[in-house]
Each structure stands twice: as C-alpha cells, then as structure tokens.
C-alpha cells in the first residue's frame, strides 16, 4: 500500500561493547534472545542483532506490529536480570524510534534520550 501507516514501530539501538566477542555472542544467542522470545507475543515481529566485530559495535533492530506491543514487552523486560546484564555489557550510543510510541512509553524510555521520527510515507506491503 502506498502511504498507509500500518502503525508499526521500529526501534534501532546502536551500541558499543568492551566485553569479548565470545561473551557478547553467548549473551545474545543463549540468554537475551531466548528470554525475549519467551516474553513476547505476536506484536514482536523482529528482534535482530548485527555486530561489527572490528569496531566492537552492534545494532539491535526491534520491529513491533504496534506501539502497544512495544510498551508491553518493554514493561515485561525492563529491570529483569537479563536486561541488567544487557546494560552492563553494552553502552547505548543512540536509540532511534521510527513510528509513534505511546506517551507513557516515551516517559519510561526518556532516560535513553531516544530520537523519535514519525511516519511520513512510503510503501507497505
């Protein structure tokens, strides 16, 4: 569809890390991803990691069917042991939200100083 906002919210988190690559991959593959899967519902469409091994940087891409799905999952995982370990392993360099999060979620994540960009137009299949 042309210029039809389906309400999806995409979260792009650029990160850096100083831990070993093995420790980071172990966390992503065997702790965080399984935990997120266990806490998510049909509103989480993507939760994918991309790593540049040379620069020790990573990007976490999360795509939600709607803003409420983002808020529900964030509420379930924030403050958990897995989330605290994530915060120990990674430094958030930049967080960008594409779409419109709920007002209460904006307050919750304001400490991460996200850049929020509203939908303008394009093609949605």
Can you say where each PLM-predicted feature lies in the sequence?
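Short S/T/G/P-rich N-terminal loop/turn motif that feeds into the first structured element of a domain
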Residues: 1-58, 65-76, 88-125
